């Protein structure tokens, strides 16, 4: 379900699948061929959410932002933190993604949490159940695990190739629902 917030309405690219029960609210942009699965909540109410192409947001995931602040004259005082997710990303079931940046070709495992102002570099894996704390930054090709999450090692080329394939698998899954 697409829900207007004030003057902002979600903007979906071509061939995007939004499953029954999913709620996409306000200033949310979703790239072509992406999918938002059952009972997800994407709240672009007090800042924006941008999701790239061929990205899948799996069941029960919540994505939110940190609010912008304005001066009395309406000018921007603090930009807050939007949530920006790259292309070919897989966000596993029941994750919380809050006011952060996730690069392209990233896999975020089930039940992971990524907090405000954190950044995950391209071609990385955040393991299931990991908690990436506020402001933590990880370089490209990172294997990120734990609570609090730590850099374990650099990913191999074979592991990086899997990340793109994982996202492409979900493009096929969502196409089955659109047919």
Name each model feature, range by range:
Residues 2-11, 15, 19, 70-96, ...:
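C-terminal segments of enzyme domains that contribute to small-molecule binding surfaces
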Residues 14, 19-20, 25-26, 31-32, ...:
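Left-handed beta-helix
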